[in-house]
Each structure stands twice: as structure tokens, then as C-alpha cells.
């Protein structure tokens, strides 16, 4: 207590002490304690967590008093770790600790809301039409009425509605759209199911039952690293954060661990007490640098150059000059380095072609099953073998898809030969593309020949067709690509680290600005540690590298380093990519629930990047051409057209999905086929070949082939992840926008070849936008209907993360406040109303669904050699081979509600599975009938019920091997049939363990090891990706079955990326068009625009939270270097404007010496609804970080039908990169709040 009264003569406290002076007797008033107790007393504590995409997945105590949440604190009862590991707790962060503020704040959505103009028209239409579908038609078919409420989007004007009214309007709109245009014109976007998997499943299940389109998120967010599927055939699999503690050398490369992985950062600091060295690699002085022994600051966007130089050192010192036995054995057994590659003859030199296959050779090396998909190598005896494990062994035969060192024909043990040097027939000159001399004036270049000729040892082989071919190994190609001289007098190879040749440390020094001595030192230390510890060197990596256009080059650079050093699959080592809470651990139990696979298959999925690139018409403004992306050795005549042309070709060849799919209502095709006397599949094939049916993507703006209804839930699409924000406003929403640039027609640019061009792009494509949220976000402002959802303390759900092995509950500590409902209850009610409204319009319908060639299915062996396009007459249209699968799905629309609320019969008829393996689920269905009870009548009679979110959670937990030991054993047994090795021992000790929802409410539960992931959870090892591949000899799901360094698909070769290369950031050409055009009298400068993850929010969540705003600056900010700020006359906290041809934004300036000159940082997802004045450029309220971005897709991410390069939802596809973007920065002159309240000001310029 305060002793301020002790200073006065007549006011004295008792001064007696006790306990040797540690205690004191006081007589002060203690009434204050009553207030303290009243504030902090509570009636109960409930366990929950935060369903936000932060990867934390922390367990929290939610304190409830009088039916209200009063506060939250961190739980500390995680299951114990091994004796040699620190505990997982404390887990939490300031953002999570502030969440209870939202529940009763002014930001909270309390009631269903509808745009006033739309409500007025809807009520008038209902008065005239008794049928809700006809009422909706009367509005949306009237162009003036539709335009009037679409143009109001983003301007407020919401009024309170009722659940009955909004559900009826939504259902009527869905029924109208399906009936007139097709179910694939109804779409939904929701990200990261792992953060609240039942809530995600609620909307996805509804959409899938009606045939709607579920949009991807991992690729759209640019969280997906395409290098992972390219190398491992795996979307992403990474170590848990506890495995950091097992490492003895860690590089944190572009990952700001203490800021963006706050709950896990203690492992990073704790491992340093063991002597582990830590290195930070970031262009700015980020918080991670404070926790490290060394900080390297390469120029932003040049990370691949530094990784190449480090790889150069590792290969020189640990593979050539002083070979590590461990490294050599590792790359021989677990990589494609021994595999043979055919060389193609060019003008005076050779180029690396595709991998040699058994089918290329006489008698196919004795392989009868899939010989064109079996890779070939020489063994150390000089014999050619097709070793076990390649993708051809996975499908069509059993028992040889493993990494045992055996000949695939004889089964005899064999050791593969890494290099042909010493046994070659001749030395050949092979060309390698070089891009290090490309780029803009903002990045350093090293001018060399654009085709570098290297000398390689080769052998000449007789092929099955009688011709001969030269071959070399991937190992030899890799050494040459890295510029390593091996006594072959190769003038383009380096003899010293000081040679400025690709890709030496001296070369990288000129590109990155990092000294060659530092590059050499870190590479040497990293590899030496890995050699001595057998792989305990780790790279933690994140969005800093993954958000660039050539992100796969950045990532493959790091992955190659790890592979060269034998780190992948070893505890304490490997690739630790953390961008997004991607790990939905009980995935195989969740998928049937989410996509209604228990009732009908397949679901409609779409990759969001291609979807939004097309339908928000961003392609109309494209400035990047395929020609500038191609290898100098490619035949450019094969790659003509616009970038969207490549996407369209990929769709029709079955590589990528489409949405909408066809240029006609898919519900009408079966009827037309019946009239023609054909089955629907044959009729569709015939119509596509004739051109009477076209892919919708070929005519995106004809008024029929665009999305019409969009659901958004668990997402702030227009306030966080929507790259090309202003284009979405104009073309999807039809409202006010800030686009400054001209489209291709206005520029006189090159028009697409595959897509019909219209001079005026179609605006306002979406008829209805429905958003579910607990707070009024930017997306809500642009919606037509807002539905109030329960917060994370008001609903039951589940949450998992890649950062730890636990599964956490979200629990309803209190009932949803006001009229809010959980996502499950909202979509259940919509499904019920839809089932009523559709009667008379939709009944039992036959839907034609196109499905791209799927990864982890036998169909991925579709196109083994060259790329052939059926539309160009290069091959026939064969569904599932040269084109998408064409599937027939029977839908029962009036039974939608009954199906939504029950588990369908397909789980018993077909079973369940994931990632290429399947198992029987009869016993699990029997258990679910007992747990959830069954439907007593109706279309789902006798099926287990899904009435509540807890019922849905129990379905996930019961069906998933990660939470049901019996299923885990069945899943491992199913995999054992493929590999010929027994893996069930990995789960037998957990066979009787079944995790229930009430179990995880009592305490977090650790998941059970499952074959659908590549790591193990047990007492002996922390989860580490690739562990089962290395230790259980389970192949990676790639062409070779090994870690794939060489990408031999024709597009990868022709775009110059079969091997790792450095590619500088692309030129988006978004600045030259606007700089100096709308001057306000202040200096302007072009700067690179980066959007790292922020400190005071998780994406946009918490960015409007008063507690977080108080800790930060209270609104949007942009960070500038001191040098750039000086040039521009900007002082700290000045209002600035950031703009380019895509749009404009306003923010406060943060001037800091931690930011290097030439770049600016606007921390990602600062809401546009807080403290934001108008833009001088647009005369509108300043935008968000994505107002100055636009998508540019990369053709190599469109590849499909090719083993590991095949489509899977969120697995592979185009990504939404944005860090190559440049903006113009200037100080604002007129600060206009656009509110008429007299707070505007003029900001004086600094001389």
C-alpha cells in the first residue's frame, strides 16, 4: 500500500513488522478490496481458444460472471513434454488477451443487417410476389434496381432485419441463380479451416450440397509455397515449434518469430541456452534480429541469390573437396540426384530435357506397369535400374512403392551412382538459363550471357525407338548449375569464391549486398553442424520470402541447402515454413463433413487466385507477358498470348479447376444429352469438341459466365486478403473504386487469344454478397447482408495448428449475445429455408461437374511426356487424361436440410481416406449412430444426426486417424499395402484411444500419428516433417518418389525453372503511368511496397480493437527509411499518400532507421474503417494495403496432370503474390476527412 501519509506528523501508520521485516502490520482501510474482488470474481471458467489465423492455437481460460465474459487468461495444463524439452506453456499473446473486448463493444454485430435500398425493394417485391424466387427475380432482372443497391456497397446504409427475412432472401437468390445459371455460379470464401474447423465446414457443407463452389485460400493468401509440392509432393508439412529445441543451428530467414509466432518464441530463445547458434536474415532490422547471434540483411527480393551462393559453398566444401559421408549417403537415398536426365540437342549445345523413363528403353527394364512413370538410374556396377519408389510403383501394383535400395525388377539391393564423372562416354556442353542480368533499375544486376554453357559428363544410350540419346544425372546437372568447376575446364564455372560467376559468393554479394565472407561463413557453419549432428540444422522461413512472384525460387534455394546437408526428415533439422494456420490435423475426418462427401462426390473446388484474377477483371490490366518470363532456350512460338490464356489452357487440359465451369447451366446438360440419345459425359465431350459448349473462362464477361452469389465467412476478404482490392470493387461489386490505370483496350495492349474481349468490362457481377462476422469489418461494409456470428467464446468448435501437436476446443462459455448465432446454426437455418423455397423450382437434378486431374490419385499419371492441347488438335479429348474428369452428380435439392443435418451413406458404401489411401469406416459409423443418435424419418432415415456443432465435431474426431487410434491403425495398414512394409507399429499402442469433444474441453489432447502426415508424435521424437520418409522409407509423393530437385515438366523447363535459378523481382509497370501525373506540390518517389504481418493484430482481427489501437498508433501506418523520408520531406507521423496505377491509400508515416532505403512497409491488414482520411488522388476515403496491388499469376503454377504437379484444393495452383509491387510515396497536402465536421487541415511541406 502507499505510504504517502507517513510524511505527515499526525497521520501515522502502524509500523510493527514481523518475519524479520518481510511483513508489516497495517491499519489502512481495505474497502478497496471489495471493488477489486467484484471486478475479478467469476462464476465459472471455460476452456476455449481463438479461431484466428495466427498459428498459435493457444488454450485459454474464459472467465464468466453473471452470464457475461469478463476476462481471459492463459491455460497452463498442456500435457507434459519429454524430460529433455521445455514445456509448451506459456502460450498466448497480447492480441488474444484482448479478445473479450470485442464481445460487448460497439464493433460487435448484434442483429442481421441488410442494405436499406435492397430491403425496401425486397419488401415491395414480396408484396407483389408470393413466391420468394419470383420476388428476387423482379429485383435482379431489373437493371436499374440491381444497379441502385450495388452502387451503394461500401457506403453504409444498413438497417436491422430479421433472421426469417434474410434467410428467405438468401435462399431465394441461391435458388434463382441455380435454376437460371447453374449452381457453380454460387460461391463461398472462407479461409484456414484449422482455426475453427466446424465453422468452416458449416458453409462449405451447404455450398457442396447445392453444387456451389468452394474457393481456396492457402494459395490465394500466398501462404502456399509452390516449392513444397514441387519438391515433396506435399502441400506443406513442417516441424512443430518444440522441435526447434532439438536443433543446434537455426537460420530464421524472413520469419519474424517473436512478432508473428509469439506463443512459440520461447523455444527459440530457450534453445540458445543449449548453445544453438541463431542467425536472422531479414532486409529490415526486425524483432527476430534481437534474438539472434548474427543478422544478415540482403536486399529485399534477392534471397534466392544468397541461397544459391550458400549452396555453392556447401557443394564445394562438403560434396566435392571434402565429401561428407553422411551427406553423400543422404542425397543418394532420398533425392532424385542419381536419376538420369535426357539431353536435347540445340544449336551448338545441349539442353536438359525430361527424366529418362523405363519406357524409353528396350524392354522397359522389365517394367510392365506404368513404365513411362518410372525413373531410371545407373547403379555403382554401371547397370541401369528402375529403383523402387518412383510414382509408377505407387499405382497399379503393390509392395514396391518404398525407398528401399532395391532394383524395381529383381528386388535385389542396389546402390545408385550419383555422378557419371569418371564413367562417362563423353563430355557435352549443356546450356543453362541465366536471369541475373534481368530486372529493373531498383535491383542490382550481374550481366552474364543469358545462356551459360557448362561441361557435363554424359553417357550415350540406345532407346526403344532405335534412336540414341545422351544422358546425365541430376547430381551432375546440379553441380554445373551452381557453377562448380570439377576439372573439366568449364569457363563458366568458378575456381574461387571470389570469381564473379553464377552463383558464387562474390556474385551474390553484388546482387544482395551481403558480404561474401558472411555468406561463406554461414554456409560453412550450417553445413558443418549438419554433418556433425546428422541433420540438426534448421531454417525457419515465412512470408518474407513467400510473397514474391518468384517465391518458388526463393524457397527452392533454402530447400536445396537443407537437402544438400541431409536435414529434411531429421529431428531438429529441416524446413520450417510458417505462414498461416494450415495444419488441419484431423483432415480426413473433416473433409467428408465439410464437402458433403458423405452424400455426393465430387465437390466443386476452385483456386481463388485464378478465380479473382478472372472475375475481378484484373487480367484486363495485365502488363507482364509470358515472353519475358520464358527461358532464353525456349521455343517462344509455343507460348503466345496473355497470362490468362495460360490459365484457360490449364483449365481445359484438366490441370486447374474452373468456376463457373462451363458456358451453360450444368443442370441442363443431362436433359440435352437424353434428347440426343447420349449419356451426359459423352454428350459433354462431343459438345466441347464441336464448340457448342465452351469453358466459361473463355467468355468471362458475356453476362452468363460469372459468379452471382458470394458467401464470405470467417474472413475479411475485402479488408485483408483481397489482392487487387480496387478491381474487386469495380468489377465484382460494381461500386466506387480507385483504379488509376488503363486496361488493355485503352492502352492498345496485346489482347488474349483464348478469351473473348469486350471493350467495356462487365461491372457489378455479384448479385448478392452475404458476410458472416462478429464485428463490422471492411468486408461487411461492402456486403448486401451481414449475419452476426457467435464469437470464439460463444460457440463449440475445434482448432489445430502446425506449431504444436494438440487439438483444442472452442467452447460456448456463454450463449451468443443479442441475436448472434454460430456458423453451424446460421447455415443450418439457410439450408432449411433453401429446402422450402426451392420446391417448384428445383427437385432431383442431374449436375455435370468438371474435376481437374487430382494429385494423390491414379489419375495423376495422366500426361507423362509432352504437353498436348486437345483444342489445338494435338490429341483427343479424353476426360481425366487430356482434359478434366466429367462427373455426373445427382442432387436432391428439397432434401438439402435433411442431408445437411445427417451423415450420408457414402461413408459406409465407399469408405474414407486421404492422400491416396483409403479404409473402411463401418465401425466408426456404428459408433456415430450411438453418439449422435439417428434420423427417425425422412430422406436420411437411419443416418447419424448432425444437429449441433458438437455432433459435427464428433464426426470429425471419430473418422480421423489423428483422433481415433483404431482408424490410425487401419490407415497405416492401408499404406503398408502400397509400400510392402509394415507401418502399423506406429499406432498400435494408441489403437484403443478415442478422443471425444468433452476430452479436449477437459485438457488439450495430443494427436495420434497418422500416415496422412509425414511426421510422428510420440515420446521419442517431436513432430518433424519428412521423418517417416527418411526413417520408415515411405516415398515422397513425387515423380521419382524422392525429394525432387529437378522439375522436368515441359513448362518448367521452358520457363527456365527445371533447376534452381535466381530470378529478380518482376516489373509490374504500375508506377510509370502515374508518377507526377496528379501532383500536390510535394516530392514523389517510387519505393518497393512490402506488407509484413503486424504486431497489433492477427491479419485484420484486433486491428480495430481499442486495446491494440492504444498500444499502436491508432490507425494505418506506413514505415519509411530515414533516407527516403528526408528526400520526400516527410517527418515521423506525417500523413502520406501511397499510390500507383492500381489505386491509392492514406496513412501516417513511421520514419525509422530499421527500414533500408528503397522499400516501404505497410503492415498487413490495417482496416480501412479506423482513422482514415480521404485520398487526394481518388477523392475517396483512403484504401487498404491491397488498394495498390494487383494479381499477376505465374504459368508454372498452373501445371497439372503430372505426378506431384497435379491439382489439389489448396495444394498447388496460382498464388496471390504482391511484394514485387512498387508505389509512389508522397506527403499529403490536404487532409480531408470527408465528413463535413470541420476537422480538415492543410499539412505544410518541409523545405
UniProtKB/Swiss-Prot annotation:
Alphabetically ordered keywords of this record: 4Fe-4S, Cell membrane, Electron transport, Iron, Iron-sulfur, Membrane, Metal-binding, Molybdenum, Nitrate assimilation, Oxidoreductase, Transport
Organism this protein belongs to: Escherichia coli (strain K12)
GO cellular component: membrane; NarGHI complex
Protein task: The nitrate reductase enzyme complex allows E.coli to use nitrate as an electron acceptor during anaerobic growth. The alpha chain is the actual site of nitrate reduction.
Bilayer topology term: Peripheral membrane protein
Cofactor note: Binds 1 [4Fe-4S] cluster per subunit. Binds 1 molybdenum-bis(molybdopterin guanine dinucleotide) (Mo-bis-MGD) cofactor per subunit.
Name used for this protein in its record: Respiratory nitrate reductase 1 alpha chain
GO biological process per UniProt: anaerobic electron transport chain; anaerobic respiration; nitrate assimilation; nitrate metabolic process
Annotated Mo-bis(molybdopterin guanine dinucleotide) binding sites: 223
Comment block on domains: Apoenzyme contains at least 2 NarJ-binding sites, one interfering with membrane anchoring and another being involved in molybdenum insertion. The first binding-site is a short peptide sequence near the N-terminus that contains a twin-arginine homologous motif.
Residue ranges of domain 4Fe-4S Mo/W bis-MGD-type in the record: 43-107
List of residues binding [4Fe-4S] cluster: 50, 54, 58, 93
Cofactors required: [4Fe-4S] cluster; Mo-bis(molybdopterin guanine dinucleotide)
Family: Belongs to the prokaryotic molybdopterin-containing oxidoreductase family.
Quaternary data: Dimer of heterotrimers each composed of an alpha, a beta and a gamma chain. Alpha and beta are catalytic chains; gamma chains are involved in binding the enzyme complex to the cytoplasmic membrane. Interacts with the NarJ chaperone.
EC number: 1.7.5.1
Enzymatic class: oxidoreductase
Reactions accelerated catalytically: nitrate + a quinol = a quinone + nitrite + H2O
